[in-house]
């Protein structure tokens, strides 16, 4: 099975499940995020990262520590609560380079960063991201912010995070996974 077929199977199976109390399925959420990135004119790798940002959840690797995930990182961007980002990026790295995997890995850290640096951001979040923020480490401290800002893909992770936050609209019918398949196929490493 190719990378794109494997991903498509996840979107068709677990992607049809409820998404942590949100009004859309996890697959709809991820496809909405990819569509928002595409509509914003993001580079192909960033569209892929937005589409795949919660792939760790689709694979059952949640922030509660189930099915692996690394409990942290020496890079200053991780906490014990971002396992789905870490696990998803690690799994995706068998096919994609860092331009796709790093924003996936860092999208939880980006939430913590935005909570620390952007007044009012926390108030924009739905209930589940606010709840998980506590065990993801809370808003970043100054040293964590500096470490995050120094990461090569931090800006892309913040963009993915914003699309992640906006991609929960039950009135929006996102394109199907097949819409993104050619983009993903073009990004798969040979």
Predicted regions and their residues:
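Metal-dependent phosphohydrolase cores
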Residues: 1-190
